[in-house]
């Protein structure tokens, strides 16, 4: 028995399913989840001392790679001054100033402790601002595990083959309207009929929880136009895409300004954190300025602020995102070439430093239906073959992959060598 197998068996005694987030259980790929004990640069090391090139990156935050010395130093220095105060700090203001300077639409920011808190709070704020109850989301898009958003969601719910979650009252779900991603005509039709009840549209500008599906040409522009027309708040969920697709997030890359945005992952440099913000007029409705309540004991935690500030400053250097995107493109091109040579139907998608891998004969992946039509069984085999070759991918056919600035030519070669053997075995 491997160390991971032993630990997984022990974990299941007191932890439901043996994991603290469902996708980690390897349910969709089979086998025993790997238990990690160390990470450095582009690599993770499991409890059996096996080393893997990491394309999960803690599900997105580790854009600098694991254990960047400057980030670790900033956290160590803050540790000397305390773990948490439950009171304002200078770093919170510094973080708000930096986020507003980097993201085109941000005028005010509120820090929270997770991406789920950020999206939940942004939706509450949109409802308070507009006085309306309904929200529009899109099939396969995941915005955290708050009740009203677990309707036809992506991420772990797709991994488990569950369209929504038990425990969500029908009275909550009835306020959530779900439309096809990348279908602006469906948005136009729905708003023409019920716009007076809709507080907001929330969307991942790049859908990163049904693998990685970029927006179709005109889709984000159409959302902005329709929200302006009907007085609906447009929320970009940039928990995944923020500071990764570009320094200014997906909104900076595509040139579309939402009314509110949510962030997480990179903004905390690997520490638990989230934030939401946007137009000053809307943010002024939140307590203590306005009637919309939101609070959090650990919001603006100084350790998270220290790690996040250092990370954002490091990724702001000229050329950083160009290098990151170039590596991602070269890696995906290499995978496609090897799949084609082996005669394996395979499609990749990319948005900056995030990517999707699909075993599909489609020309492109544009819709939720395209994602669901891909061969999840073949991905399952590919995942384990890549593990055997020393490459750790997301353990689900419905999760995006992530690269870091620590990935270089050596990691690229390991990845492509493993893929060549894997595709040959999949013929």
Curated annotation (Swiss-Prot):
Keywords: Cytoplasm, Isomerase, Porphyrin biosynthesis, Pyridoxal phosphate. Its main location: cytoplasm. Pathway: Porphyrin-containing compound metabolism; protoporphyrin-IX biosynthesis; 5-aminolevulinate from L-glutamyl-tRNA(Glu): step 2/2. Pfam families: Aminotran_3. Its cofactor is pyridoxal 5'-phosphate. CDD domains: OAT_like (cd00610). One of its GO terms (biological process) is protoporphyrinogen IX biosynthetic process. It is found in: Cytoplasm. GO terms for molecular function: glutamate-1-semialdehyde 2,1-aminomutase activity; pyridoxal phosphate binding; transaminase activity. It catalyses: (S)-4-amino-5-oxopentanoate = 5-aminolevulinate. The modification N6-(pyridoxal phosphate)lysine is found at residue 265. It comes from the Bacteria. InterPro entries: 4pyrrol_synth_GluAld_NH2Trfase, Aminotrans_3, Aminotrans_3_PPA_site, PyrdxlP-dep_Trfase, PyrdxlP-dep_Trfase_major, PyrdxlP-dep_Trfase_small. Homodimer. Belongs to the class-III pyridoxal-phosphate-dependent aminotransferase family. HemL subfamily. This is Glutamate-1-semialdehyde 2,1-aminomutase. It comes from Pseudomonas putida (strain GB-1).
